[in-house]
């Protein structure tokens, strides 16, 4: 998946972009790890509870120039993008709540912003 100026997970109605106020230390504070190439990568499990092993992972990667990003929710193998927004079960609702928690943290710390 190439880097783009805006990104959204499969099925999401909200599009995000890198905030112009982004700081490298803020990325590290929220859990981003700097890769060998200099990019910043965040991987967070979306399991609602430790006992539920859904295997879904939120992946956000920001380019080293802090201008572009990649974003996806992937399954256990880490390759196939998954849509957590189409299922209406209680379990899926808990997964969406955890996803929203992570995204709100990134918005509050000015790592990302919502595109109008």
Predicted regions and their residues:
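Terminal, regulation- and interaction-focused segments at domain boundaries
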Residues: 1-30, 112
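Generic signature of intrinsically disordered, low-complexity segments enriched in small/polar residues
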Residues: 6, 19, 35, 43, ...
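Ser/Thr-rich, low-complexity intrinsically disordered terminal regions
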Residues: 16-17, 21-66, 81
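C-terminal basic regulatory modules in eukaryotic proteins
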Residues: 61-116
